[in-house]
């Protein structure tokens, strides 16, 4: 099972260090066999070398080694920090920052060429969801245009936009139906994200169509994230 915590723009270097130390100790003490990933804020990406049991990834990077891309991080900087995992296509970057499907695909191609583990996000708006399951699947598949679905280090996270940060997760029936339809087109792991928390993670991950979870705000407290790991 794959569990990934996305801190977004939360936590400082100090609090991230504290979080990772406690999480690493917990994973060691419980002999955790799950694959645990964490996407911290960019200023804490250098906590890679001495933290065991957790794979650290970047929430974003520009598809170039370096260059005149103000405010961005390139692969040259990530290489120095030994980062080999990246999150691409999150709805907040698509919606708030205007990242197009073409740009997400460009990022994918570039970081796939470098052998990165890629968490690639897809998800629909409430308007699309209300149009029915066929419209929902068409929309999500359109967000996979330009993505090599046979790439061996690809992990896809289905995150319905209307469930992200709202506290309202998709129903188990919606998750199961959507994952089953998407899996007909995929061979890679398919995670669920969207208001996953302590109260619903066990039942969501009990669905055979779900291979793990990408967790946002509910993962910000290390005690809660550890409890979620224990529940699966």
From Swiss-Prot:
Active site: 90 (electrophile), 159 (proton acceptor)
Source domain of life: Bacteria
InterPro entries: Aldolase_TIM, TIM_sf, TrioseP_Isoase_bac/euk, Triosephosphate_isomerase, Triosephosphate_isomerase_AS
Family annotation (PANTHER family): TRIOSEPHOSPHATE ISOMERASE (PTHR21139:SF42)
Assembly and interaction partners: Homodimer.
Family affiliation: Belongs to the triosephosphate isomerase family.
Compartments in which it is found: Cytoplasm
Entries under SUPFAM superfamilies matching the protein: Triosephosphate isomerase (TIM)
Gene Ontology cellular component annotations, sorted alphabetically: cytosol
Biological processes per GO annotation: gluconeogenesis; glyceraldehyde-3-phosphate biosynthetic process; glycerol catabolic process; glycolytic process
Pfam families in UniProt: TIM
Binding-site list for substrate: 6-8, 165, 195
Protein name: Triosephosphate isomerase
GO MF term list: triose-phosphate isomerase activity
Entry keyword set: Cytoplasm, Gluconeogenesis, Glycolysis, Isomerase
Protein's pathway: Carbohydrate biosynthesis; gluconeogenesis; Carbohydrate degradation; glycolysis; D-glyceraldehyde 3-phosphate from glycerone phosphate: step 1/1
Function according to Swiss-Prot or TrEMBL: Involved in the gluconeogenesis. Catalyzes stereospecifically the conversion of dihydroxyacetone phosphate (DHAP) to D-glyceraldehyde-3-phosphate (G3P).
Catalytically driven reaction(s): D-glyceraldehyde 3-phosphate = dihydroxyacetone phosphate
Keyword Cytoplasm applies: yes
NCBIfam families assigned: PRK00042.3-2 (NF000728)
EC nos: 5.3.1.1
